[in-house]
Design a protein with these regions (language model features):
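Conformational switch/transducer regions in large eukaryotic molecular machines and scaffolds
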Residues: 1-148
Length: 148
């Protein structure tokens, strides 16, 4: 429930990490965003999903938990992007220059209400701050059983 609050759940397979994350999100009144991995899921689909997640949390200003499972880690770039989200709130080069005006228009009213300013840099900073406040990353990682 805390702004910028994230979680990492580690346990053996079937221990209820994802169920616990969904229950905690429901209790906190936070929606859960889960990506659906298919055989053809690659970096392009990942980036599209991250754009949707950023629009939910940054433009729509909706608190959302991003539940990511270790079995969904198909490419190393996924982990790098999650690291960037956790450290700075953004993924470098996620948006093209042609996509930025729609984001600026989406946050302009809220930024004006918050007296944040109306330049492109100020609107982008407001967008990133909204993402950082509303996005809660939950990593659910498996730990193999120890034979000892």
């Amino acid at each position: 429930m805390m702004p910028r609050g994230n979680a990492m759940l580690v346990g053996v397979g079937g221990s209820g990490r994802q169920s616990l994350a969904r229950l905690a999100s429901h209790i906190a009144g936070i929606g859960v965003f889960v990506i659906e991995i298919t055989k053809l899921y690659r970096l392009i689909e990942w980036r599209d999903d991250m754009k949707r997640l950023f629009e939910i949390t940054g433009v729509s200003n909706t608190p959302t938990a991003f539940l990511f499972n270790d079995t969904q880690l198909k490419e190393q770039a996924f982990l790098e992007d999650i690291n960037n989200i956790l450290s700075s709130g953004e993924i470098p080069s996620l948006y093209g220059k042609d996509e930025l005006p729609a984001i600026y228009d989406g946050v302009r009213k809220r930024a004006a209400d918050a007296e944040s300013g109306g330049t492109a840099e100020e609107l982008w900073a407001f967008f990133i701050e909204s993402i950082r406040s509303n996005l809660h990353v939950i990593l659910a990682m498996s730990q193999p059983l120890c034979p000892y």
